A protein has these predicted regions:
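Ankyrin-repeat junction/capping positions
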Residues: 8, 41, 75-77, 110
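Ankyrin repeat boundary/linker residues
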Residues: 11, 44, 78-80, 113
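Start-of-repeat signature of ankyrin repeats
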Residues: 14, 47, 81-83, 116
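Ankyrin repeat A-helix N-terminal signature
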Residues: 20-26, 53-60, 89-95, 122-128
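Ankyrin repeat structural motif
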Residues: 26-35, 59-69, 95-104, 128-136
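Ankyrin-repeat C-terminal turn/loop position
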Residues: 38, 72, 106-108, 140
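Leucine-rich solenoid repeat scaffolds
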Residues: 108-139
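Non-catalytic interaction/regulatory modules that flank or connect domains
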Residues: 141-261
């Protein structure tokens, strides 16, 4: 007990010592070693950097914050099963504040780990609704309530209010193992904003999107999913709200919009 940083450093490298101090939650010592030139990306035998370790424990939030401020790589990748980036690890453990910290600091939410899962996939599997909505709101081109029409077309013409249902939808980029590949968009449909598992995912790059007739009082967007041969008809959450439908149509066409979450 009471060892100075100098005496401890003689026994191990500064880089490894920084890792150990991060685990211990010693923020001041981590800052001191950083100022002395310690490398932030030292990797332990399991492939974890100091930031990855800090993102696995809610008690190390301040350590994670300092490491990021000092320049730690928020997208450091740990190979192997159940691994990935700091964001994957924070999501897996349900650390909502750490997830928000990473996203606001430039963490890439579209990276897939060796299990071919994005951080959003992990959040859905874990059933964490707050983190699912947080990630979607960060990466989305559009998100919000909509109406979905269903049933025979002739019935909708007579009583559309009886053949529509409220849904929660998001237009988001598909995850990728290669950040250099062009983004492909998906329209994700949930029964409600409290559901973590999508009811439907439409690959928009493999769909026909028909521009709404905005001259109609209550226009609708028609999407035909080529892969499932299914047609979807969507309208704004509030009847006659053409602006929201404009946002949805533009988002499906690849133009980012304001995310309403």
């Amino acid at each position: 007990m009471g060892q100075s940083l100098d005496s401890m450093t003689q026994k191990q490298s500064k880089d490894e010592l920084l890792y150990q101090l991060a685990i211990a939650g010693n923020v001041d010592a981590v800052k001191a070693l950083c100022s002395e030139g310690a490398i932030l990306e030292w990797i332990d035998r399991d492939g974890k950097t100091p930031l990855i370790v800090a993102c696995m424990d809610s008690g190390l939030y301040n350590v994670a914050k300092v490491l990021i401020e000092m320049g730690a790589n928020v997208n450091a990748y740990r190979p192997g099963r159940h691994a990935g980036t700091p964001l994957h690890h924070a999501v897996k453990r349900g650390l909502e504040q750490t997830v928000k910290l990473l996203l606001s600091s430039g963490a890439n939410a579209l990276v897939r780990n060796d299990d071919c899962q994005t951080a959003l996939d992990v959040a859905r599997i874990k059933g964490n609704i707050n983190i699912v909505r947080t990630i979607e709101s960060h990466i989305c081109y559009f998100t919000g309530w909509l109406r979905e029409f269903y049933g025979p077309g002739f019935l909708r013409a007579f009583a559309p209010q009886f053949l529509s249902r409220k849904i929660w939808a998001a237009v988001i980029p598909q995850g990728s193992s290669n950040p250099m590949t062009p983004k492909k968009l998906e329209l994700v449909i949930y029964p409600s904003s409290q559901d973590v598992q999508p009811r439907t995912i439409i690959a928009l790059w493999n769909a026909e999107i028909e521009e709404p007739n905005f001259n109609r009082p209550d226009p609708e967007l028609t999407i035909f999913d080529q892969s499932t041969k299914t047609q979807y008809k969507l309208a704004s959450a509030n009847e006659g709200d053409k602006q929201q439908l404009h946002w949805l149509y533009d988002a499906c066409s690849g133009i980012p919009q304001v995310c309403w979450f």
